[in-house]
A protein has these predicted regions:
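Accessory helical-bundle/CTD segments and flexible terminal tails appended to RecA-like ATPase motors
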Residues: 1-196
């Protein structure tokens, strides 16, 4: 569309068409590597985590920050965004800190191939997660009532009883980030366990 016509105006139509043709040919012949995208990781926790309008005023900038946070691959990327927010907008409000913590959790989960971190009912669901039998027993000992389904590589970890984490409450009301801390510890424990 309009973005392409800007490129065409810069280089001229004939040169632009030749460049596009060469790029398509390079891609088809394998000269350009087809990038493997890291699997998406869905994190669903009942917690208030967002960038408020009164903190980051521009909608376009907020959307860009959300995209960047969703794409982070390692904790250092989250730290870089945290420093940028501090520099541009000052001290982070609670919900912005929670959003950065969710991004760090997502990066940790992605780095171990986990695509789902979901609090549902009375369980935290992690999938896919491969646990050898010794680690399954450890899971049951550390988190009584938990279930591991080997065929689907799904761990259902019993959530601690805490009224602030009630999934029936709207997420906007939940400001307690201890669930997020607990989930991060669980993912860290189980991924360390699955790599030994």
């Amino acid at each position: 569309g309009g973005e392409q016509s800007g490129h065409i105006a810069d280089v001229g139509f004939d040169l632009y068409m030749r460049m596009v043709g060469e790029a398509v040919n390079d891609y088809k012949t394998g000269i350009i590597d087809k990038e493997e995208e890291a699997p998406e990781c869905k994190v669903e926790l009942p917690i208030n985590a967002h960038l408020a309008e009164n903190y980051v005023p521009g909608e376009r900038l907020r959307l860009d920050l959300y995209r960047r946070l969703a794409d982070v691959a390692k904790p250092a990327d989250v730290q870089s965004i945290r420093e940028e927010l501090l520099d541009r907008f000052g001290e982070l409000p609670e919900e912005a800190n929670a959003l950065l913590a969710v991004a760090q959790l997502r990066a940790l989960a992605k780095s171990h191939g986990i695509r789902e971190v979901v609090a549902t009912g009375k369980f935290l669901r992690l999938a896919p997660l491969t646990l050898p039998e010794s680690r399954q027993l450890r899971l049951m000992r550390l988190y009584p009532g938990s279930i591991y389904k080997a065929p689907t590589r799904t761990a259902l970890i019993t959530l601690p009883k805490n009224p602030a984490w009630n999934p029936s409450k709207p997420a906007a009301e939940i400001v307690d980030t201890s669930l997020l801390t607990w989930v991060t510890e669980v993912v860290d424990q189980l991924t360390k366990a699955s790599t030994t």
